[in-house]
Amino acid sequence: MKNLLIPLLFICVLGSAQTRPIAIIGYHIGTVALGAIADAQFDEGNKNLAHMLHATEVVTLISGPFIFDVKRNEALAYILSYGFLRFSFFDSAYNLTRDLPILFNGSTSTYDRVMNTVPEHGRAFMKSWSLVVGVSIPIKYF
């Protein structure tokens, strides 16, 4: 968990001094990391810490559009950017927190079973393109 908290704090501090698109990208990545850390802590048995981190994640998700003054016509781009960045980073952040291999997928959820049918290089390819799209959307539309 320590491996992820330092970059998360770094993103928060640097994000406040950036242009709007870069700040939105950093905010989304930080929120995704927060959720992944919370899920990993919950699965490790640290329920109180996990609940606190999940509550913080919900607050950041709800407050994001107000912080960045997202207009109605920008809302879809904002949501899509978050979705693509979440697909790119969530599993990796979760796995780093739990000390698992970075491209590891479990076997319990439907998502895990579907992703396990894709070879590792295919998963890396999908997550890489998702990262490119997730970063490109705020740069183009904000």
Model-derived segments and spans:
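Intrinsically disordered, low-complexity peptide-like regions
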Residues: 1-4, 26
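Sec-dependent N-terminal signal peptides
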Residues: 3-14
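Hydrophobic alpha-helical membrane segments
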Residues: 18-142
